[in-house]
Curated annotation (Swiss-Prot):
Binds 1 Mg(2+) or Mn(2+) ion per subunit. It comes from Scheffersomyces stipitis (strain ATCC 58785 / CBS 6054 / NBRC 10063 / NRRL Y-11545). Belongs to the isocitrate and isopropylmalate dehydrogenases family. Its EC number is 1.1.1.85. It catalyses: (2R,3S)-3-isopropylmalate + NAD(+) = 4-methyl-2-oxopentanoate + CO2 + NADH. This is 3-isopropylmalate dehydrogenase. Gene3D superfamilies: Isopropylmalate Dehydrogenase.
Length: 373
């Protein structure tokens, strides 16, 4: 069996970014050593992004970071930003927007579920309401109002107004609909799809709904699609989140808001992974960028951040970009075992450190893979 080499560009970013990336790398190295399913080698290339890049180079995304990302199989990102860099002309978050655009990462995937039923009690909602919640938000990431034409207040003739534009094309909506459909078809039976929009008010949402319907009818007639207005969906998410189980597809801004709302259901942002893909994972080798849903947590002392979201992002990477499904399943099971055993950071009412949780996952995934040999 020949060794397959997979190149991963690591962009730790700012504050806790370095710590969580370190734990994720340890997990990948453990999988490389222990997996009986293939001979695989992970090659890591470390580069700057965000505030760390601004401090070192003056820009939030240096050219060498972008070039490294483009030439790798996948990108692992820590977190960017912090009060140190403020809201001036050059901001850490610009690096994130630029890399998404430059790598054409058009689909953001954010699962909302419980890594372990032992965590149900941590949800701010009642256990009986959230038990069984399991959906993935598929958010369009490079179109819509965040990338539309705009005018700042200072640029207006009277200095009294500002505007942004929400624009979507049929091609953009078709592409994200296919991604959602593909994610639904990865399951047996296929998952239902919910499309969220504001078609009762917005022209862009009417195009969105019409295009989603056309693509689903012509290309995926075996799948079920239901439309929900975004404000109604926001209510359902709190009242009865399991109603949205399946795949939830929506635009850039609506997806930004609804996925953040969904992120509080499992009780901690420290649990939630995300993937941003540039192509369909139809051969389990889509190019993607993987990062936790939480931010850089500048106020958190060292060795306190929860590494689980980043480790579960690695599980998504193994499944969608690195063609390592068995290893992804083993890693998710390892996380479940560690959380069930009570090894947890403070955000999950635990007493363990970042490194202790990371080491526990390394030990668990190593055992699972070796037992499978």
């Amino acid at each position: 069996m020949s060794t397959v080499t997979k190149t991963i560009t690591v962009l730790p970013g700012d504050h806790v970014g370095t710590e969580i990336c370190n734990e994720a790398i340890k997990v990948l190295e453990a999988i490389e050593q222990a997996t009986p399913y293939q001979k695989i080698h992970f090659e890591f290339k470390h580069h700057l992004i965000g505030g760390a890049a601004i401090d070192s180079t003056g820009v939030p995304l240096p050219d060498d970071s972008l070039a490294a990302a483009k030439s790798s199989d996948a990108v692992l990102l820590g977190a960017v930003g912090g009060p140190k860099w403020g809201t001036g002309a050059v901001r850490p978050e610009q690096g994130l927007l630029k890399i998404r655009k430059e790598l054409n990462l058009y689909a953001n995937l954010r699962p909302c579920n419980f890594a372990s039923d032992a965590l149900l009690e941590l949800s701010p909602l009642k256990s009986e309401i959230v038990k069984g919640t399991n959906f993935t938000v598929v958010r369009e990431l490079v179109g819509g109002i965040y990338f539309g034409e705009r005018q700042e207040q200072e640029e207006s003739a009277d200095g009294e107004s500002a505007w942004d534009t929400e624009k979507y094309s049929v091609a953009e909506v078709t592409r994200i609909t296919r991604m959602a459909a593909f994610m639904a078809l990865q399951h047996n039976p296929p998952l239902p799809i919910w499309s969220l929009d504001k078609a009762n008010v917005l022209a862009s949402s009417r195009l969105w709904r019409k295009t989603v319907d056309k693509v689903m009818k012509e290309e995926f007639p075996q799948l079920t699609i239901q439309h929900q207005l975004i404000d109604s969906a926001a209510m359902i998410l709190v009242q009865s989140p399991t109603k949205l189980n399946g795949i939830v597809i929506t635009s850039n801004m609506f997806g930004d808001i609804i996925s953040d709302e969904a992120s509080v259901i499992p009780g901690s942002l420290g649990l939630l992974p995300s993937a941003s893909l540039a192509s369909l994972p139809d051969t389990n080798s889509a190019f993607g960028l993987y990062e936790p849903c939480h931010g850089s947590a500048p106020d958190l002392p060292e060795n306190k951040v929860n590494p689980i979201a980043t480790i579960l992002s690695v599980a998504m990477m193994l499944r969608l970009s690195l063609d390592s499904l068995k290893e992804a399943e083993a890693l998710e099971e390892a996380v479940r075992q560690v959380l069930d055993s009570g090894v947890r950071t403070a955000d999950l009412r635990g007493t363990n450190s970042t490194k202790e949780v990371g080491e526990a996952v390394v030990a668990a995934v190593t055992k699972i893979l070796k037992d499978a040999a």
